[in-house]
Amino acid sequence: MPDLLLLGLIGALTLLLLLTLLAFAGYSGLLTGVTVSAGSPPIRNITVAYKFHVGSYGDTGHLFTESCSISPKLRSIAVYYDNPHTVPPEKCRCAVGSILSEGEESPSPELIHLYQKFGFKIFSFPAPSHVVIATFPYTTPISIWLAARRVHPALDTYIKERKLCAHPRLEIYHQDKIHFMCPLARQGDFYVPEVKETERKCRELAEATDTQTDGTGADTSDASSVSLDVRPGSRETSATTLSPGAGNRGWDDGDNRSEHSYSESGASGSSFEELDLEGEGPLGEPRLNPEAKLLGPPRELSTPERGEE
């Protein structure tokens, strides 16, 4: 009899533990549906303090911790420029930091000086008219791990199915939500100067490799195959506890094309101007029709083109 009682007690405790783990996972967002849409951005123009990082996105946790420790009340932000599924981890680029101000408000000189004292740089991002957006609960450290494996694949699918030009990837941590945002306009204004510098170096390396290949008749380096063609464009805007990055990111990308940066994956896609609007969202913002397609009839091939076929 005592043995049966002991076994029953062990079984009850095991069941209670499983129910607790399931409840914790559900609270972290395991059962939360991921809805991706296009519309107005969740934020206005912002000024951020950031540090640039080249390497695995899973190694950015200390940057989140550092920025949060300086001013815990500020929202954290991360901007990811490369697709970690196609770019080697040691070459992935991102900017991590805190949002100092939003809209017409300017950050205080004291706050700017404080972040600069710890090696952060100051930069401004505009508010694009349209973005691809998604949200996910931010309640526990597990939420970050779940978001990396559920939201990013959903964003990839949404963008590729509609052939959108949406880059780079932004994550904004605000209270109990993680806001994911991919600009559909003014993308170049979201590229910090360090990205342009690394792109310039990659371009110079590719040109040097091409020159060496032309001179020897054989390709002696594969450096040109990994050059990142970001094309950030010209900027119109400039400016002189949980660790969100602690979760190891495992973004899924089923496409087997040779894209590297997010800008390359959508370089041939359409912008929001080529899509039909579905109407207004719950806050009055315009929404894009999920079934929208490119406007215009298919182009007839000219005579030379037919001849080539």
Curated annotation (Swiss-Prot):
SUPFAM superfamilies: Probable bacterial effector-binding domain
Motif window: LIR motif: 272-275
InterPro entries: Reg_factor_effector_dom_sf (IPR011256)
One example GO MF annotation: signaling receptor activity
Residue ranges, Lumenal side: 1-3
Keywords: Autophagy, Chromosome, Cytoplasm, Cytoplasmic vesicle, DNA damage, DNA repair, Endoplasmic reticulum, Membrane, Nucleus, Phosphoprotein, Transmembrane, Transmembrane helix
Alphabetical list of Gene3D superfamilies matching this protein: Regulatory factor, effector binding domain
Entry-annotated residues carrying Phosphoserine: 238, 243
GO biological process: protein-DNA covalent cross-linking repair; reticulophagy
Residue stretches of biased makeup (Low complexity): 208-225, 263-272
Region feature (Disordered): 193-309
Cytoplasmic face of the membrane: 25-309
Quaternary state and interactors: Interacts (via the LIR motif) with ATG8 family proteins MAP1LC3A, MAP1LC3B, GABARAP and GABARAPL1. Interacts with VCP/p97; bridging VCP/p97 to covalent DNA-protein cross-links (DPCs). Interacts with TOP1 (when sumoylated).
Domain description: The LIR motif in the cytosol-facing C-terminal region is involved in the interaction with ATG8 proteins.
Role description: Major reticulophagy (also called ER-phagy) receptor that acts independently of other candidate reticulophagy receptors to remodel subdomains of the endoplasmic reticulum into autophagosomes upon nutrient stress, which then fuse with lysosomes for endoplasmic reticulum turnover. The ATG8-containing isolation membrane (IM) cradles a tubular segment of TEX264-positive ER near a three-way junction, allowing the formation of a synapse of 2 juxtaposed membranes with trans interaction between the TEX264 and ATG8 proteins.
Name of the protein in question: Testis-expressed protein 264 homolog
Organism name: Mus musculus
